Every structure is written in C-alpha cells, then in structure tokens.
C-alpha cells in the first residue's frame, strides 16, 4: 500500500508543471512555425506570470476566509482544465489571427494562459494538500514535480524537436536570399560566404551556410496529445489518492494524540523524580532539533526569501535566456543542456530522500553555489553570439555542465526548504507556494523588458557565425 501511495503521489506531483514544461521543450519546433519567432520564450514568460492571479486569489482566500477554502475541489478543477487545454493545444497551436500590425498566435497565448493558471495555482494547492499525508511523501511529491520537466523533455528528444543542420544556400546576384540549397554540411569551415565568378570576372552568385531545421519525427499534434494524456494520468492519480482507505488527516492527528498521551503519562511517572525530563517528550514531538530552523521569525523570513529568490532564478530569469547562452555553442550543446538540466531536477529531488540536510547555512551556501553557475549562464547569454570558448569543445562542456549544476543545486534547495516548512504547518506550505509564484513573477518582470524592449541579447546562427579568436 505504501509503494502504491508513493507511485500515486509521484504521478500527482508530475501534474504540477508538466504542461508548461512541455511548452518549453517544444519551443525549438514552435518558433519555426509561429509568427513571434524567437521572441516567443519571453512572451510565454510574461503570459505565464499573468496567470499568477490564480495563486494570488487562493492565498488571499486562505488568509481572510480559511474556512471556505478546500484544496480538493480546486485541484480536481485545475487538473481537468489542464487536460482539456492540452487537448485543445493539439488542434489550435498554429492558428493565428491578424492583430494591429501583423499576425499573432492569439489562440496559442490564450491556451498558454489557462495552462499557466493550472500550473501556477498548483503551487498553492498541491503543497497544502500534501500536509494531509505523512512527511515521507513530500519528497516523493518533489520527485514527481521534477519528472514534470524530464518526461516532456524525453518526448521532445524522441520527437527530434528543433534539431538543425547547416546547408549551403545559393543567392543569385542582386536578389533576395534563396532557400534553394546546393549541398549539406554539419559544421562551418573558413568563411561563411563565397562568391562564384565566371571567366570575365562577373559575379554570378553567392554561397553561404545557413541553419535549417530537420523534420520532426512526429508533429506537435501528437506531442500535445501525449501531454494531455500525462495530465489525465495526474487527475486519475489524485482521484485514487482520495479513494485511499487511510484518512489523509490521520498522520497529523495520530501524532498529536501520541503527544497528548505522553504528556499525560509523564507527571505520574515522575512524581518522586522531580521535574520531568524533557528528553522523551521532545523526541515524541517529531525531532524538534530539525525544526528549529523554522521556529525563529528571522529564520522563517530567511526561508521565504530564499524560496522566492531560488524560484526567481529557475522559473523567471534564466529560462528567458537559455537559448542565447547555449545556441552559440551549437544545437548539440543546446539540446544537451535542456535535456540534462531537466534530468537534474528529479535526480536532485531523489537525492534529497537519502541525503537530507536541513541546515540553513548549508542551504544558503548551496544557493550561492547554484547562483554562481546561473551567473555564468547569464554571462554567456550577454556575450552571445560570441561567448567564451565558442567553437571549442571545452566551451560546450562548460555550458552544459553549468546548466545541469545550476538546476541541480537549486532544485535540492527547493526540496529541503519545502520539507522544513511542511514540518511547521499547513499554512506555511500555502505561503511557500505564494513565495514560489512571487519569485517567479519578479524574475519574469525583470527579464521581459531586457529581452524584448531593450534587446540586450543577440541570437546566433551557429552555421554562419564567425567570431574573432
């Protein structure tokens, strides 16, 4: 029964962000079809953050009307909406409308908003629901949350989403560039453009290398239907969790009952022994030495600030520039960084099950370390299209490793902070979810003008890129 519950909790946790993560990994294929092009990631970031109206409403209701708020119907609703929205995506993702000065993916943006509303609201409903289960299941929930990024990434990898190659493109003189190709290559040598001449010296045509996307193994329609199936599995898992014979609140009630019993017995045993020894009583309260990190108000404030900061980096700041930081090193580096960093998330959560460390100084140091890797990723994005060691194998290894370690370190921190707050109270988990969304919102609001308005980042075409040594 315990193994089945772990499996259900893991599947349930996967539903927290699987839909939005699926959109992100499908972006390399979507940007070639939608009119927004490579500005689509920053548009998505803003649309996703607008959906924070959902968690804001839930948090306000929890604060002012806690008695009228029940997570169960909200969770059923958001999972059902997510399943339907993913199914609609399969048929409407490429529908465009003429708005103001051009065509825009209005249907895509509207459906993205509903998916984001589902996933953002999960932060303030799924975690409080987990307080009804024994503490050992919370880490399993975070493993499932990590799988919400890994499984779509593996599907996108099987799809071949966004794989590119370099082709020779012939451009006749005094004409616009042609898409006709005269050959294919997989890397760039020498100059990126040559001119053909006849015997009289007249220029005939220009030949240069350009990136071309390879056909996907299956269409976005199939991909989004698979996403809808994943969401349906999450809905079924939550339904089965509700049908489990053991009441969800029993773990907490049993703990409180055992504490009352122990406290009521202690004075009788200690009538002739002086003041009661606090040792056994404190042990019965669930290892308070591990919970002291969240007992002091300053420590609690530090935890919430850390939650907001970590999620600002992982959900708002760095995702907006991943393409800029990786594509200059080539499509292989980009795909490895996206896929392996998605694998780092559940692996870090799984590691926390066997190597838990609740020390706030340790988590602070790990946050600084992860932030350092994030700073390297940001620096390479700023230096695009000619970052450090561009064109060298060491540069590719560094950028992939940096993204993996960035996600891995901060994912571990997020899990342990959630475990600390879970031991405090259900309300602490609600505010933890609010801090998650606040940090994500602030990160997105910071990056949107930098990417779309000021345009501080330059995209790179790996095939035609020439950087000075």
Curated annotation (Swiss-Prot):
InterPro entries assigned to the protein according to its UniProt record, in alphabetical order: Riboflavin_transptr
Superkingdom, taxonomy of origin: Eukaryota
Cellular-component GO terms for this entry: plasma membrane
Pfam families in UniProt: SLC52_ribofla_tr (PF06237)
Regions of this protein lying in the Cytoplasmic compartment: 1-6, 65-71, 127-137, 242-297, 357-361, 418-427
Residues annotated with Phosphoserine modification: 251
Keyword Membrane appears in the UniProt entry: yes
Reaction(s) the record says it catalyses: riboflavin(in) = riboflavin(out)
Membrane-spanning segments: 7-27, 44-64, 72-92, 106-126, 138-158, 221-241, 298-318, 336-356, 362-382, 397-417, 428-448
Biological processes per GO annotation: riboflavin transport; sensory perception of sound
Glycosites: 94, 168
Example GO molecular function: riboflavin transmembrane transporter activity
Renumbered residue ranges of the record's region Disordered: 266-290
Keyword annotations from UniProtKB, A to Z: Cell membrane, Glycoprotein, Membrane, Phosphoprotein, Transmembrane, Transmembrane helix, Transport
Recorded topology in the membrane: Multi-pass membrane protein
Extracellular face residues: 28-43, 93-105, 159-220, 319-335, 383-396, 449-469
Subcellular location: Cell membrane
PANTHER family per record: SOLUTE CARRIER FAMILY 52 (PTHR12929), SOLUTE CARRIER FAMILY 52, RIBOFLAVIN TRANSPORTER, MEMBER 3 (PTHR12929:SF4)
Entry similarity comment: Belongs to the riboflavin transporter family.
Protein function: Plasma membrane transporter mediating the uptake by cells of the water soluble vitamin B2/riboflavin that plays a key role in biochemical oxidation-reduction reactions of the carbohydrate, lipid, and amino acid metabolism.
The name this protein goes by in its record: Solute carrier family 52, riboflavin transporter, member 3
Source organism: Ailuropoda melanoleuca (Giant panda)
